[in-house]
Every structure is written in C-alpha cells, then in structure tokens.
Amino acid sequence: MDRTVLPYLSSPANRETLYGLLHSYAFRLFLRDILALRDRYQPERLGPFFSPESVDGMARQVERLGLIRRKAGGTIRFLAEAVTDFGETFEWFVAEILRRQFAADALWGVTIPGLPCGGDFDVLALLSGKLLYLETKTSPPKHIEQKEMSAFLARVKTLSPDFAIVLVDTHLRMKDKLVPLLSEGLRAEGMSDGEMTRVEKETFSWERRIYLTNAKRDIVSNLTLCLRTYFVGRFFG
C-alpha cells in the first residue's frame, strides 16, 4: 500500500471521495500526470485535453484530499512523496469496483513467491466461484510492448484462472496495436487460433476466456460487458 496514495488520505471519508473521483477518466489522467510531473508540474504542461478551469477544479479536489499543496505561480508540492506513479492506486480502484459493483472478493497487488512467471498479479477476484485475473495498464498503448503482453499470458498460463482481463486505462483504440500484440502472444503460446475477436466496440476476447478492453464509455460498463460475455458464454454456449 505504500506505493499508493491511500496512506496519505487522512480519513475514511477522503478514501470514499477519492473512489468517487477516480470514476472520472479526466481526473485519473490529471492524477497520473501530476504524479509523473511532480515539481515540474505547470497547468499548461497537461496539454489540450484539459481546460484551465478543469485543471484548477481538479487541483483543488486533490489539495482537499491532502495529496498536494498548491503554491504561487501555479506550481504544486506533492505530499505523497513515496508514490511515483498511478499504477498501484489504479489497481486498488479496480479491485474496489469489483467489490462494490459486482460483489466480488478481490485482492490487488498480489505477489505469489516462487513462480516462474514472476508471480505479480495486479488484481485477483472471485466472482460466482470463478477466479478472475485482471491486469491493469495505465500507460497509453504506444508505451505497451510485446514483452508485457507475453508476460501477462505467462502469468495466465501459470495461474490458470477461469478467465482473465487486460484493462487499459485509455480512450484510445485497442484494435490498432494491442489486439495484434495479444494475438501474437497467444500464437507464440501455441494457440493456432489465437486471433482476438471483437465483442463490442473496443472490447475483444479470445475464446471468451481472455479479454482486452479500455476505459472508453467507462470502466464499469466495459467490465460488465466482459463479465456478461464470459458467464453467458459459459452457461448458454
């Protein structure tokens, strides 16, 4: 937990506030960017996705949570000094979604020692007696490479969950880069029919067991689609 922002929240109410705010894709981008920029943060560095008004509003929200202190000239001091990226906070958020929205038993940041695949699992959840392994990605697709998809598949092969999901926190398309990478990884694992197929929009699956989706629309809707496709396919063919 020490690499998430959670220890820096002063009360359970602030944790609830953070959970609510993280449902906003814009807020997640903002938090991810200020974690990366830290003392180099300037509102204009966040790019055209953010208006000055939205940046100011989100900065106020993060300051009220006690994570930053705003200074003169638009700079900030990041108070959660041990947190260097958004990845593990996002893992916590996704595990909370699975608990709250889908009544799952969920763990995040799981390490199983001694496994040949490295044994690091972002989120593990039990839903209706079925084990889900969910891999989270907070980098945009252009920064995700074949070795990461291959490592994900190696963990799937080692753990052998009932089904698995790769969730990429982006509104960008999955079809252009990540679908080919995952399909190539499946073929490298000996799956001659390893082509990912479209379920709906930017959600894809392989044999209704491995899923790839993004955050466009929203995370809850896309996870709902993956879960519905898996369970309907399992029970109704």
Model segments located where?
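Intrinsically disordered, low-complexity Ser/Thr/Pro/Gly-rich regulatory segments
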Residues: 1-237
